[in-house]
Protein backbone atom coordinates (compact mmCIF):
# COMPACT_ATOMS: atom_id res chain seq x y z
CA UNK A 1 0.00 0.00 0.00
CA UNK A 2 1.04 3.59 -0.34
CA UNK A 3 3.36 4.67 2.44
CA UNK A 4 2.29 7.91 4.12
CA UNK A 5 -0.23 8.40 1.34
CA UNK A 6 -3.68 9.63 2.24
CA UNK A 7 -5.08 9.78 -1.27
CA UNK A 8 -8.23 7.76 -1.81
CA UNK A 9 -11.18 7.58 -4.12
CA UNK A 10 -13.76 10.05 -2.83
CA UNK A 11 -17.36 10.86 -3.46
CA UNK A 12 -16.31 12.42 -6.78
CA UNK A 13 -15.68 8.90 -8.04
CA UNK A 14 -19.39 8.00 -8.16
CA UNK A 15 -22.65 9.84 -8.87
CA UNK A 16 -24.33 11.59 -5.97
CA UNK A 17 -27.19 9.50 -4.61
CA UNK A 18 -30.36 10.63 -2.89
CA UNK A 19 -30.10 10.27 0.89
CA UNK A 20 -31.68 7.26 2.60
CA UNK A 21 -33.65 8.25 5.68
CA UNK A 22 -33.46 6.28 8.89
CA UNK A 23 -29.88 5.05 8.48
CA UNK A 24 -27.26 5.33 11.23
CA UNK A 25 -23.63 4.26 11.19
CA UNK A 26 -21.28 2.85 13.82
CA UNK A 27 -17.54 2.26 14.04
CA UNK A 28 -15.42 0.78 16.84
CA UNK A 29 -13.31 3.88 17.55
CA UNK A 30 -12.31 6.85 15.43
CA UNK A 31 -8.81 7.27 16.84
CA UNK A 32 -6.39 6.18 14.11
CA UNK A 33 -5.67 6.23 10.38
CA UNK A 34 -6.23 2.73 9.10
CA UNK A 35 -8.12 0.76 6.51
CA UNK A 36 -11.15 0.34 8.76
CA UNK A 37 -11.38 4.11 9.19
CA UNK A 38 -11.26 4.55 5.41
CA UNK A 39 -14.21 2.16 5.15
CA UNK A 40 -16.11 4.18 7.76
CA UNK A 41 -15.50 7.30 5.68
CA UNK A 42 -16.77 5.53 2.56
CA UNK A 43 -19.89 4.57 4.48
CA UNK A 44 -20.33 8.18 5.53
CA UNK A 45 -20.11 9.25 1.90
CA UNK A 46 -22.57 6.53 0.89
CA UNK A 47 -25.08 7.72 3.50
CA UNK A 48 -24.46 11.44 3.66
CA UNK A 49 -25.75 13.05 6.84
CA UNK A 50 -26.08 9.79 8.77
CA UNK A 51 -24.72 10.00 12.34
CA UNK A 52 -21.69 7.86 13.16
CA UNK A 53 -21.72 6.34 16.65
CA UNK A 54 -18.40 5.29 18.15
CA UNK A 55 -16.76 4.55 21.49
CA UNK A 56 -13.85 7.01 21.19
CA UNK A 57 -13.09 9.94 18.92
CA UNK A 58 -9.59 11.45 18.68
CA UNK A 59 -9.66 14.00 15.82
CA UNK A 60 -5.89 14.56 15.89
CA UNK A 61 -5.21 10.83 15.50
CA UNK A 62 -7.51 10.04 12.61
CA UNK A 63 -8.31 11.27 9.10
CA UNK A 64 -9.30 14.94 8.94
CA UNK A 65 -12.32 14.06 6.77
CA UNK A 66 -14.13 12.90 9.91
CA UNK A 67 -14.55 16.59 10.78
CA UNK A 68 -17.30 16.62 8.14
CA UNK A 69 -19.09 13.63 9.69
CA UNK A 70 -21.62 13.76 12.54
CA UNK A 71 -19.46 11.69 14.91
CA UNK A 72 -21.19 10.84 18.20
CA UNK A 73 -18.77 9.34 20.74
CA UNK A 74 -19.88 7.58 23.91
CA UNK A 75 -19.37 8.94 27.45
CA UNK A 76 -16.14 6.94 27.81
CA UNK A 77 -14.65 9.44 25.35
CA UNK A 78 -14.19 11.87 28.26
CA UNK A 79 -11.01 10.00 29.24
CA UNK A 80 -8.21 11.50 27.18
CA UNK A 81 -5.76 8.66 27.85
CA UNK A 82 -8.23 6.22 26.28
CA UNK A 83 -8.78 8.42 23.24
CA UNK A 84 -5.04 8.48 22.67
CA UNK A 85 -4.63 4.69 23.10
CA UNK A 86 -7.83 2.74 22.55
CA UNK A 87 -6.15 -0.54 23.54
CA UNK A 88 -6.05 0.63 27.16
CA UNK A 89 -9.85 0.97 27.00
CA UNK A 90 -10.32 -2.72 26.23
CA UNK A 91 -11.67 -3.71 29.69
CA UNK A 92 -14.31 -0.95 29.57
CA UNK A 93 -15.59 -1.05 26.00
CA UNK A 94 -18.07 -3.91 26.28
CA UNK A 95 -20.02 -2.07 28.98
CA UNK A 96 -19.81 1.21 27.07
CA UNK A 97 -21.10 -0.40 23.88
CA UNK A 98 -23.83 -2.37 25.68
CA UNK A 99 -25.16 0.87 27.17
CA UNK A 100 -25.49 2.49 23.74
CA UNK A 101 -28.83 2.23 21.94
CA UNK A 102 -29.41 3.76 18.51
CA UNK A 103 -32.82 4.69 17.19
CA UNK A 104 -32.64 3.91 13.48
CA UNK A 105 -34.40 1.87 10.83
CA UNK A 106 -31.04 0.40 9.81
CA UNK A 107 -27.77 0.52 11.75
CA UNK A 108 -24.71 -0.16 9.57
CA UNK A 109 -21.81 -1.11 11.86
CA UNK A 110 -18.17 -1.14 10.76
CA UNK A 111 -16.70 -3.54 13.28
CA UNK A 112 -13.51 -5.30 14.28
CA UNK A 113 -14.95 -6.28 17.62
CA UNK A 114 -17.12 -3.59 19.24
CA UNK A 115 -19.57 -1.73 17.00
CA UNK A 116 -21.48 -4.92 16.24
CA UNK A 117 -22.61 -4.92 19.88
CA UNK A 118 -24.52 -1.62 19.68
CA UNK A 119 -28.26 -2.22 19.97
CA UNK A 120 -30.78 -0.61 17.66
CA UNK A 121 -34.52 -0.29 17.25
CA UNK A 122 -34.28 -1.41 13.63
CA UNK A 123 -32.27 -3.81 11.49
CA UNK A 124 -28.53 -4.26 11.98
CA UNK A 125 -26.01 -4.83 9.19
CA UNK A 126 -22.44 -5.58 10.30
CA UNK A 127 -19.44 -4.99 8.05
CA UNK A 128 -16.77 -7.12 9.73
CA UNK A 129 -13.11 -6.29 9.10
CA UNK A 130 -12.09 -9.24 11.28
CA UNK A 131 -13.44 -11.02 14.37
CA UNK A 132 -12.02 -9.45 17.53
CA UNK A 133 -8.25 -9.92 17.25
CA UNK A 134 -7.63 -9.32 20.96
CA UNK A 135 -9.81 -12.39 21.65
CA UNK A 136 -8.82 -14.73 18.84
CA UNK A 137 -5.33 -13.48 17.85
CA UNK A 138 -4.13 -11.76 21.02
CA UNK A 139 -0.40 -12.26 20.42
CA UNK A 140 -0.50 -10.76 16.93
CA UNK A 141 -2.86 -7.95 17.93
CA UNK A 142 -0.85 -6.45 20.77
CA UNK A 143 2.56 -8.04 20.58
CA UNK A 144 1.76 -10.09 23.67
CA UNK A 145 3.82 -13.10 22.73
CA UNK A 146 7.01 -14.21 24.36
CA UNK A 147 9.54 -11.44 24.54
CA UNK A 148 7.07 -8.61 24.08
CA UNK A 149 7.95 -5.40 25.85
CA UNK A 150 6.39 -2.14 26.82
CA UNK A 151 3.72 -0.98 29.23
CA UNK A 152 0.99 -0.99 26.62
CA UNK A 153 1.66 -4.56 25.48
CA UNK A 154 1.76 -5.79 29.08
CA UNK A 155 -1.44 -3.91 29.92
CA UNK A 156 -3.27 -5.40 26.96
CA UNK A 157 -1.96 -8.88 27.82
CA UNK A 158 -3.29 -8.55 31.37
CA UNK A 159 -6.62 -7.31 30.03
CA UNK A 160 -6.99 -10.16 27.53
CA UNK A 161 -5.95 -12.77 30.12
CA UNK A 162 -8.35 -11.45 32.77
CA UNK A 163 -11.30 -10.33 30.68
CA UNK A 164 -10.91 -12.63 27.67
CA UNK A 165 -13.38 -15.37 28.72
CA UNK A 166 -16.20 -12.94 29.54
CA UNK A 167 -15.47 -10.83 26.46
CA UNK A 168 -15.70 -13.90 24.23
CA UNK A 169 -19.17 -14.60 25.61
CA UNK A 170 -20.14 -10.96 25.01
CA UNK A 171 -18.66 -11.02 21.51
CA UNK A 172 -20.55 -14.15 20.50
CA UNK A 173 -23.85 -12.71 21.70
CA UNK A 174 -23.17 -9.41 19.97
CA UNK A 175 -22.39 -11.11 16.65
CA UNK A 176 -25.71 -12.92 16.67
CA UNK A 177 -27.72 -9.72 17.12
CA UNK A 178 -26.95 -8.82 13.50
CA UNK A 179 -29.52 -9.37 10.78
CA UNK A 180 -26.87 -9.46 8.08
CA UNK A 181 -23.10 -9.91 7.99
CA UNK A 182 -20.71 -8.55 5.40
CA UNK A 183 -16.95 -9.20 5.34
CA UNK A 184 -13.98 -7.73 3.50
CA UNK A 185 -12.42 -10.93 2.12
CA UNK A 186 -12.83 -14.68 1.79
CA UNK A 187 -10.30 -15.09 4.61
CA UNK A 188 -12.55 -13.20 7.02
CA UNK A 189 -15.60 -14.96 5.58
CA UNK A 190 -14.08 -18.26 6.72
CA UNK A 191 -13.13 -16.79 10.11
CA UNK A 192 -16.66 -15.48 10.70
CA UNK A 193 -18.06 -18.89 9.78
CA UNK A 194 -15.64 -20.74 12.06
CA UNK A 195 -15.91 -18.38 15.05
CA UNK A 196 -19.56 -17.34 14.91
CA UNK A 197 -21.22 -19.91 12.66
CA UNK A 198 -22.49 -17.06 10.49
CA UNK A 199 -22.62 -17.04 6.69
CA UNK A 200 -21.41 -13.68 5.39
CA UNK A 201 -21.26 -11.97 2.01
CA UNK A 202 -17.84 -10.83 0.78
CA UNK A 203 -17.85 -7.14 -0.12
CA UNK A 204 -14.25 -6.00 -0.71
CA UNK A 205 -13.53 -2.55 0.72
CA UNK A 206 -12.57 0.31 -1.57
CA UNK A 207 -8.77 0.36 -1.26
CA UNK A 208 -6.90 3.62 -0.83
CA UNK A 209 -5.29 3.08 -4.20
CA UNK A 210 -2.77 5.67 -5.25
CA UNK A 211 -4.08 7.59 -8.26
CA UNK A 212 -2.08 6.70 -11.35
CA UNK A 213 -2.59 10.06 -13.05
CA UNK A 214 -0.95 12.42 -10.54
CA UNK A 215 2.47 14.06 -10.47
CA UNK A 216 5.56 11.87 -10.80
CA UNK A 217 9.07 12.25 -9.37
CA UNK A 218 11.92 9.82 -10.06
CA UNK A 219 13.79 8.14 -7.22
CA UNK A 220 17.56 8.56 -7.25
CA UNK A 221 19.82 5.53 -7.22
CA UNK A 222 17.30 3.04 -8.58
CA UNK A 223 18.63 0.72 -11.28
CA UNK A 224 16.36 -0.85 -13.86
CA UNK A 225 14.93 -3.37 -14.39
CA UNK A 226 13.57 -3.79 -10.86
CA UNK A 227 10.70 -5.33 -8.94
CA UNK A 228 9.00 -3.49 -6.10
CA UNK A 229 8.10 -4.51 -2.55
CA UNK A 230 5.82 -2.13 -0.62
CA UNK A 231 5.48 -3.09 3.05
CA UNK A 232 6.02 -2.05 6.62
CA UNK A 233 9.32 -3.52 7.76
CA UNK A 234 7.95 -6.01 10.27
CA UNK A 235 8.91 -9.67 10.72
CA UNK A 236 5.67 -11.16 9.38
CA UNK A 237 5.99 -9.18 6.14
CA UNK A 238 8.82 -11.55 5.06
CA UNK A 239 10.80 -8.79 3.36
CA UNK A 240 14.05 -10.58 4.18
CA UNK A 241 12.92 -13.55 2.10
CA UNK A 242 12.07 -11.26 -0.80
CA UNK A 243 15.56 -9.72 -0.63
CA UNK A 244 17.24 -13.12 -0.76
CA UNK A 245 14.94 -14.38 -3.51
CA UNK A 246 15.42 -11.45 -5.88
CA UNK A 247 19.18 -11.51 -5.27
CA UNK A 248 19.24 -14.94 -6.93
CA UNK A 249 17.85 -13.58 -10.20
CA UNK A 250 20.49 -12.16 -12.56
CA UNK A 251 20.04 -8.65 -13.95
CA UNK A 252 17.10 -7.78 -11.69
CA UNK A 253 17.09 -5.34 -8.78
CA UNK A 254 14.70 -4.94 -5.87
CA UNK A 255 13.34 -1.66 -4.47
CA UNK A 256 11.70 -1.77 -1.04
CA UNK A 257 9.31 1.00 0.00
CA UNK A 258 8.43 1.27 3.67
CA UNK A 259 9.91 1.63 7.12
CA UNK A 260 9.76 -0.15 10.44
CA UNK A 261 11.68 -1.80 13.26
CA UNK A 262 13.29 -4.34 10.91
CA UNK A 263 15.01 -1.70 8.80
CA UNK A 264 18.51 -1.97 10.27
CA UNK A 265 18.58 -5.75 9.94
CA UNK A 266 17.23 -5.60 6.39
CA UNK A 267 19.77 -2.95 5.40
CA UNK A 268 22.56 -5.25 6.57
CA UNK A 269 21.09 -8.13 4.58
CA UNK A 270 20.65 -5.95 1.49
CA UNK A 271 24.25 -4.77 1.73
CA UNK A 272 25.43 -8.37 1.93
CA UNK A 273 23.46 -9.72 -1.05
CA UNK A 274 23.45 -6.57 -3.20
CA UNK A 275 21.00 -5.48 -5.92
CA UNK A 276 18.60 -4.06 -3.31
CA UNK A 277 17.56 -0.48 -2.54
CA UNK A 278 15.69 0.36 0.67
CA UNK A 279 13.90 3.57 -0.29
CA UNK A 280 12.20 4.04 3.09
CA UNK A 281 9.20 6.32 3.17
CA UNK A 282 8.48 7.91 -0.19
CA UNK A 283 6.12 10.58 -1.44
CA UNK A 284 3.09 9.82 -3.58
CA UNK A 285 4.94 11.30 -6.56
CA UNK A 286 7.90 8.98 -6.03
CA UNK A 287 5.67 5.97 -5.46
CA UNK A 288 3.88 6.63 -8.75
CA UNK A 289 7.24 6.64 -10.53
CA UNK A 290 8.24 3.38 -8.87
CA UNK A 291 5.02 1.59 -9.78
CA UNK A 292 5.09 2.94 -13.33
CA UNK A 293 8.69 1.79 -13.90
CA UNK A 294 8.70 -1.51 -12.01
CA UNK A 295 8.54 -4.87 -13.74
CA UNK A 296 6.06 -5.89 -11.07
CA UNK A 297 5.35 -6.19 -7.35
CA UNK A 298 6.36 -8.89 -4.85
CA UNK A 299 4.02 -9.51 -1.90
CA UNK A 300 5.09 -12.24 0.53
CA UNK A 301 3.19 -11.60 3.77
CA UNK A 302 -0.08 -12.96 5.11
CA UNK A 303 -2.80 -10.32 4.79
CA UNK A 304 -6.53 -10.37 5.51
CA UNK A 305 -7.02 -8.08 2.52
CA UNK A 306 -4.25 -7.88 -0.07
CA UNK A 307 -4.14 -4.18 -0.96
CA UNK A 308 -0.75 -3.62 -2.58
CA UNK A 309 -1.49 -5.78 -5.67
CA UNK A 310 -4.47 -3.53 -6.42
CA UNK A 311 -2.27 -0.47 -6.19
CA UNK A 312 0.20 -2.07 -8.60
CA UNK A 313 -2.68 -3.10 -10.87
CA UNK A 314 -3.83 0.52 -11.12
CA UNK A 315 -0.52 1.12 -12.91
CA UNK A 316 -0.88 -2.00 -15.06
CA UNK A 317 1.78 -3.90 -13.12
CA UNK A 318 1.49 -7.61 -12.19
CA UNK A 319 2.19 -9.12 -8.77
CA UNK A 320 4.00 -12.21 -7.51
CA UNK A 321 2.06 -12.97 -4.31
CA UNK A 322 1.77 -15.56 -1.57
CA UNK A 323 -1.09 -17.93 -2.35
CA UNK A 324 -2.93 -17.22 0.87
CA UNK A 325 -4.98 -14.64 2.72
CA UNK A 326 -6.39 -11.62 1.00
CA UNK A 327 -4.21 -12.05 -2.07
CA UNK A 328 -6.57 -14.82 -3.15
CA UNK A 329 -9.15 -12.08 -3.66
CA UNK A 330 -6.99 -9.36 -5.17
CA UNK A 331 -4.69 -11.31 -7.52
CA UNK A 332 -6.11 -13.09 -10.56
CA UNK A 333 -3.45 -15.67 -11.49
CA UNK A 334 -2.46 -15.59 -15.12
CA UNK A 335 -4.22 -12.29 -15.65
CA UNK A 336 -2.85 -9.93 -13.00
CA UNK A 337 -0.06 -11.95 -11.44
CA UNK A 338 1.36 -15.25 -10.25
CA UNK A 339 1.23 -17.09 -6.93
CA UNK A 340 3.86 -18.88 -4.88
CA UNK A 341 2.82 -21.47 -2.33
CA UNK A 342 5.05 -20.72 0.65
CA UNK A 343 6.96 -17.74 2.07
CA UNK A 344 10.27 -19.37 1.19
CA UNK A 345 13.20 -18.04 -0.83
CA UNK A 346 13.01 -20.73 -3.53
CA UNK A 347 9.26 -20.29 -4.03
CA UNK A 348 9.48 -16.51 -4.22
CA UNK A 349 12.40 -16.60 -6.65
CA UNK A 350 10.59 -18.99 -9.00
CA UNK A 351 7.46 -16.82 -8.97
CA UNK A 352 9.41 -13.63 -9.65
CA UNK A 353 11.22 -15.30 -12.54
CA UNK A 354 7.87 -16.43 -13.95
CA UNK A 355 6.52 -12.89 -13.59
CA UNK A 356 9.47 -11.40 -15.47
CA UNK A 357 9.19 -13.93 -18.33
CA UNK A 358 5.43 -13.67 -18.88
CA UNK A 359 3.69 -11.23 -21.19
CA UNK A 360 1.08 -9.09 -19.44
CA UNK A 361 -1.78 -6.98 -20.79
CA UNK A 362 -1.68 -3.67 -18.95
CA UNK A 363 -5.32 -2.87 -19.79
CA UNK A 364 -6.56 -6.17 -18.32
CA UNK A 365 -4.61 -5.56 -15.13
CA UNK A 366 -6.00 -2.03 -14.78
CA UNK A 367 -9.54 -3.28 -15.41
CA UNK A 368 -9.12 -5.74 -12.53
CA UNK A 369 -8.20 -2.88 -10.19
CA UNK A 370 -11.32 -0.99 -11.28
CA UNK A 371 -13.57 -3.77 -9.98
CA UNK A 372 -12.56 -2.76 -6.44
CA UNK A 373 -13.59 0.87 -6.84
CA UNK A 374 -15.42 2.87 -4.21
CA UNK A 375 -18.30 3.35 -6.66
CA UNK A 376 -18.96 -0.39 -6.73
CA UNK A 377 -18.60 -0.67 -2.95
CA UNK A 378 -21.07 2.16 -2.34
CA UNK A 379 -23.59 0.86 -4.87
CA UNK A 380 -23.71 -2.59 -3.26
CA UNK A 381 -23.79 -1.17 0.25
CA UNK A 382 -26.75 1.07 -0.58
CA UNK A 383 -28.54 -1.84 -2.23
CA UNK A 384 -28.11 -3.96 0.90
CA UNK A 385 -29.31 -1.19 3.22
CA UNK A 386 -32.34 -0.54 1.00
CA UNK A 387 -33.22 -4.23 1.21
CA UNK A 388 -33.01 -4.08 5.00
CA UNK A 389 -35.14 -0.93 5.09
CA UNK A 390 -37.89 -2.88 3.33
CA UNK A 391 -37.65 -5.55 6.05
CA UNK A 392 -38.10 -2.99 8.84
Give each language-model segment a name.
Residues 46-115:
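Active-site donor-binding segments of glycosyltransferases and PAPS-dependent sulfotransferases
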Residues 143-181, 189:
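Membrane-proximal helix-turn-helix segments that form the acceptor-binding/catalytic region
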Residues 207, 213-237, 243-249, 255:
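Conserved donor-binding/catalytic core segment of Leloir-type glycosyltransferases
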Residues 264-285:
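Nucleotide-activated donor-binding/catalytic signature segment of Leloir-type glycosyltransferases, i.e.
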Residues 292-304, 317:
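Acidic donor-binding loop of glycosyltransferase active sites
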Residues 299, 318-322, 331:
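Short hydrophobic beta-strand element within catalytic cores of glycosyltransferases
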Residues 333-334, 338-345, 352-359:
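Conserved acidic donor-binding segment of nucleotide-sugar-dependent glycosyltransferases
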Residues 343, 356-386:
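A charged, aromatic-enriched C-terminal amphipathic alpha-helix characteristic of glycosyltransferases
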Amino acid sequence: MAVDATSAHTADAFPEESPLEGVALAHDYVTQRGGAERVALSMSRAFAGAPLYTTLYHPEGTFPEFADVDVRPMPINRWGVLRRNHRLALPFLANAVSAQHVEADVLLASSSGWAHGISTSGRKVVYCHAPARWLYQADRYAGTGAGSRGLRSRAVKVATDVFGPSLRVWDQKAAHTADRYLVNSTVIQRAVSQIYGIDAEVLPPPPAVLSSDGDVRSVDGVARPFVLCVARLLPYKNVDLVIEAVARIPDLDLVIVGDGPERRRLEALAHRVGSTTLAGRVTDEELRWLYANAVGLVAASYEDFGLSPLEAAAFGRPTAALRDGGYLDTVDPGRTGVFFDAPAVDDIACAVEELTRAEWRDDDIRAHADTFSEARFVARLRQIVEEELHHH
